[in-house]
UniProtKB/Swiss-Prot annotation:
GO terms for cellular component: ATPase complex; cytosol; peroxisomal membrane; transporter complex. It is an enzyme of class 3 (hydrolase). ATP binds at residues 763-770. It is a peripheral membrane protein. The gene is PEX6. This is Peroxisomal ATPase PEX6. Its EC number is 3.6.4.-.
């Protein structure tokens, strides 16, 4: 790419132009007269991390001198009366841009009404004239404003940018709102609130906001000196600078009454996304005004040379977990020294100084290694505080001062207490490129709201001198549901110190006799040196089950004593430190709440369950992971979400998955996207981005389910459709009434009317009960959770009932979901008739009844289907209304038409010979054939056809070898000689007749009469 000067033109044309000198640099020597138009790609410096590349149609402009490119201002709706970006990167595009398949244009409401009165041809003509669209010439892109404020391009398919062919490109017009006009208004100098006779003001009270990322030097006008203190740069619109009467690059003072700081202000060049009524500063400046939303900005009248140089400066570490770890100290102090001495820094007493470092590299860091150029990836941040400042003759300094590495003596000592800035006020995470943390919308995540309220209340009590000794237990029935993320996010949002200890990583001779003492002592050692300097703080003990055991499953007396001792010691630890250090909150997390002993739970004031995300919560999680900042965090390639991605559909497809599964899905989708769009030219037409589409995400979701669903027991949507089932039309209608109504019209049941959630299929074996249950799940997009009786049994007392509870909990986590109990009579037989010594089956039935009772009221989106051959063996309580209250008999087809429908469903994917008549075949079948018998009939017919064709192939091979004097094997014959006809299998009528002749019905006529008697008995009762 070539660095070129950039100018914007006010003409309504969509053509760019380049100077002859730039053209020669890009394409080689130019002829005297350039007769054709060409294309160049332009990349503007950006105030965000995500700059896009534009391809524009260009011409040669002989009036431009030097390396200059001129862009139409409409390309970014640039207000020409404000300072503009004057540099860009330009590259020649030597191939013709692709033609777009479709373009979606949003049209202002009133204009849309007028356009609908025109023919399609006149509509295109209007857009062509007003938008300066050249047929197969002008490059358009998503987000482009054709003419302000009336038309904007919403989407381009299949690329981000390309050509419009009026004959091939489909143009869709969408009606916009009348608010488009206000949205498109440009913020230029005409928006200034200065009267004609009014001069600039000395002071301006304005909103102070934190920059989301450092500003690149190409956007600093005028260019800053290399030794300028860039941590004191602030940025504002030209309107703000004009009102203050200062020029870009001037010194200003920021003050909130109690605090005052010197800064250097630069104008925000257009185009940019910043608000014109705010001033933007770095985290180092914003943190000193953490209590103020607005600051007073005024011109600084002094000179930098007048600021005194300190003779000695004492800097203290701000107490935090990272600042207390010895392994980090070398790299932290090295980075602190580099930060202070790299520029002509200006400091104040009590200034907070941020220092970032690479925690992964800290253990290998040394002074010798620091002499080499190492690519660090800073992932952590600590704060330092300017404690005492002395000038010459030991005179204390209370104002601004400078540090000269040749004169100033720096001393780091002591540890001071200061809370980290709240992320809502000072977004240091985004600015320094630290790993982002999911922000919980407390309107959607009710458990996050409760946890946030608990921590907020505890902090307020501490600020008012009350020590409430808060302890919280976060628990879940599934792993990786976001308990640690919840704690980190809340602490960052509120500005509270976090001391995080993963108990799974503690292993101080775990098998030794005094393991309890070692573990508790290690926890105390980790926190007791930090807590005195971090009030208020949260001590987070993750994976509590890692150091605890379930007491009722321990048979060894010594181990039982150790387990009880561990619970008592941890409870004592909570009490000791919450009393010794007011404002300390202990938060524990576990995936097995039943392992936590009563000694700990009695000391825990709050227990919060963190469930598997609901569909609404998964929408929030997907939206966050697919946002530009998170999607491109630490990514070598730039990714973006395509317009065909529907977050709500992704949330529906990912039922039952945890946040870590969703993160894995997005990462897999990025891999799929990269493999699909490796070519450089493909990237060019996508604006420098790789767009993740819905197919990438759907493939990633299916892959995640295939890999993890069986191992973790996650329900998934099967793949059985109504077309795969024949002869059960009456039953389908009953199912639609039971399941489809609550899903489509939940408001009908909001008034308190109980819905029917349980269906029981009964009848002879092989009549399609399991297949029908899967078809229900598939056609209503419900997850399918199949339960077998032996899976529920466990040798320990109470565990079998717990397994029943876990089944229903996993199904609730995967709503909407169908729980299918196959062979229900083995799971829930009549109570009192079993001979098991512990009464396990009776307790399972009782637990199943209790779970079913909860479905009619709190089981929205949860359905239970049972299947049995012997409904007379079921416990009668299961069949009362509110449980399995819908009994559907799936019998044997009693008409030839139903039998023919079954045959059509089973042979749907067969290649049938014209002589095959399924109606005639059904007419020859007795009425004792079940669905399974018909399946066997079709399978045997296919096998007969394959055997017949295999015999024909053997004859063809032998005949060919004799005729051509060859010795081909069957495999060689298929590789060299065989045609498509030889490899296709066509099932003939004779194959069906042979299969029917050999088929033995699975249900005799006597057995069928027995099932009919059972049906009559149930229907009459």
């Amino acid at each position: 790419m070539v660095i070129a000067n950039l100018v914007f033109s006010a003409s309504g044309t969509s053509l760019a132009s380049v100077s002859r000198e730039l053209y020669c640099t890009l394409f080689g020597p130019a002829p005297d007269e350039l007769k054709h138009e060409f294309y160049v790609s332009v990349q503007l410096p950006s105030y965000s991390r995500h700059a896009k590349t534009y391809v524009v149609q260009s011409t040669l402009n002989e009036t431009l001198e030097g390396q200059v490119v001129q862009l139409p201002s409409k390309i970014e709706d640039v207000p020409l009366d404000t300072p503009l970006i004057d540099l860009c990167k330009v590259e020649a595009v030597r191939e013709r841009p692709p033609v777009l398949e479709s373009v979606t244009i949003e049209v202002h409401g009133s204009l849309y009404e007028e356009l609908t009165k025109l023919s399609e041809e006149d509509q295109l003509r209007f857009l062509q004239i007003r938008g300066d669209l050249r047929d197969c010439g002008t490059v358009v892109r998503a987000g482009q404003k054709l003419f302000v404020p009336w038309c904007q391009i919403l989407d381009c398919v299949p690329y981000y940018q390309g050509l419009i062919d009026l004959q091939r490109t489909r143009i869709l017009l969408l009606k916009g709102t009348d608010a488009m006009e206000s949205c498109h208004l440009r913020k230029g100098l005409e928006d200034l609130k200065l009267r004609p006779n009014e001069g600039p003001t000395k002071e301006l009270r304005i909103m102070l906001r934190c920059l989301e990322q450092p500003i690149e030097r190409a956007l600093l006008v005028p260019a800053a000196d290399t030794d300028d203190d860039d941590s004191l740069f602030v940025f504002a619109s030209a309107a703000v600078l004009l009102r203050l009467g200062v020029t870009s690059g001037a010194r200003v003072t920021l003050s909130d009454g109690a605090t005052s700081r010197i800064a250097k202000v630069f104008v925000l060049l257009s185009p940019n996304h910043f608000d014109s009524d705010a001033i933007y500063a770095t985290p180092r400046l914003v943190v000193n005004f953490a209590e103020a939303d607005k600051v007073v900005v005024s011109k600084y009248e002094g000179e930098m040379a007048e600021l005194p140089v300190a003779s000695s400066v004492s800097i203290s570490r701000v107490g935090s977990w990272e600042n207390s770890q010895m392994v980090y100290q070398k790299i932290i102090l090295n980075n602190l020294t580099n930060f202070i001495t790299a520029k002509q820094r200006i400091f104040y007493k009590d200034d907070l100084v941020p220092v970032t470092f690479d925690s992964d590299f800290s253990a290998m860091f040394s002074d010798q290694l620091n002499e080499f150029s190492v690519d660090y990836h800073d992932d952590s941040l600590v704060w330092f505080k300017i404690d005492t400042v002395k000038l010459n003759d030991d005179i204390p300094c209370e104002g601004a001062f400078r540090i000269d590495s040749k004169v100033t003596k720096l001393v780091t000592c002591n540890v001071s207490s200061s809370p980290p800035p709240p992320l809502s006020k000072c977004d240091y995470v985004s600015y320094y490129g630290l790993e982002p943390c999911f922000g919980y919308d407390r309107r959607v995540f009710d458990y996050a709201k409760r946890f946030h309220d608990i921590i907020t209340t505890s902090r307020k009590c501490f600020q008012h001198g009350m020590n409430v000794g808060t302890t919280v237990m976060l628990h879940s029935s599934s792993v990786s549901v976001g308990k640690t993320t919840l704690v980190r996010s809340t602490c960052r949002e509120l500005g509270i110190h976090l001391i995080e200890i993963d108990l799974l990583q503690l292993d101080p001779h775990m098998n030794s006799s005094n393991s309890t003492v070692n573990i508790v002592a290690l926890i105390r050692a980790k926190i007791e040196n930090v807590l005195p300097h971090t009030a208020p703080s949260v001590v987070y003990l993750a994976h509590l089950e890692g150091v605890l055991e379930k007491e009722d499953q321990i048979s060894d007396p010594a181990s039982l004593k150790a387990a009880k001792s561990m619970g008592i010691e941890l409870a004592k630890l909570f009490t000791d430190y919450t009393e010794l250090y007011p404002g300390t909150v202990f938060v524990c997390s576990t995936d097995a709440l039943d392992v936590v002993p009563e000694a700990i739970r009695s000391k825990t004031k709050f227990e919060i369950e963190v469930p598997v995300p609901t569909e609404t919560q998964r929408v929030e999680i997907f939206s966050w992971y697919l946002s530009p900042d998170v999607l491109n965090f630490n990514a070598s390639q730039q990714f973006a979400m395509d317009h065909d991605v529907t977050i709500s559909r992704l949330a529906l497809q990912s039922a039952g998955l945890t946040p870590i599964d969703i993160r894995s899905i997005v990462e897999s989708a990025k891999v799929c996207c990269y493999q699909r769009s490796k070519e450089k030219q493909h990237m060019l037409w996508q604006g420098g981005y790789r767009y993740i589409n819905s197919a990438d995400l759907s493939a990633a979701i299916n892959k995640a389910r295939d890999e993890f669903s069986d191992s973790i027991g996650a329900p998934k949507i099967p793949n059985v459709f109504w077309e795969d089932i024949g002869g059960l039309e009456m039953v389908k209608g009953e199912i639609l009434d039971t399941i489809d109504m609550p899903l489509k019209f939940p408001e009908l049941f909001a008034s308190g009317m109980k819905k029917r959630s349980g269906i029981l299929f009964y009848g002879p074996p092989g009549t399609g009960k399991t297949l029908l249950a899967k078809a229900v799940a598939t056609n209503f997009s419900l997850n399918f959770f199949s339960v077998k009786g032996p899976e529920l049994l466990n040798m320990y007392i109470g565990e079998s009932e717990a397994n029943v509870r876990r089944v229903f909990q996993r199904a609730r986590d995967a709503k909407p979901c169908v729980i299918f109990f196959d062979e229900l009579d083995s799971v829930a037989p009549k109570r009192g008739n079993q001979g098991d010594s512990g009464g396990v089956m009776d307790r399972i039935v009782s637990q199943l009844l209790a779970e079913l009772d909860g479905l009619s009221t709190g089981g929205d989106g949860l359905f239970v289907i049972g299947a049995t051959n012997r409904p007379d063996l079921l416990d009668e309580a299961l069949l009362r209304p509110g449980r399995f209250d819908k009994l559907l008999y799936l019998g044997i087809s009693d008409t030839n038409e139903k039998q023919a429908n079954i045959l059509r469903a089973l042979t749907r994917k067969f290649t049938l010979d014209p002589d095959v008549s399924l109606d005639d075949l059904a007419a020859s079948c007795p009425f004792t054939y079940t669905g399974a018998d018909f399946y066997a009939l079709c399978s045997d017919a296919m096998l007969n056809a394959m055997t017949r064709i295999a015999g024909n192939v053997d004859e063809k091979v032998a005949s060919y070898n004799r005729a051509h004097n060859k010795n081909y094997s069957v495999r060689q014959w298929f590789d060299v000689i065989a045609t498509a006809e030889d490899t296709s299998i066509t099932v003939c009528m004779q194959d069906f007749v042979k299969a029917q002749r050999e088929l033995v019905p699975s249900v005799s006529e006597g057995e069928l009469n027995h099932y009919l008697a059972i049906r009559d008995n149930f229907e009459s009762s």
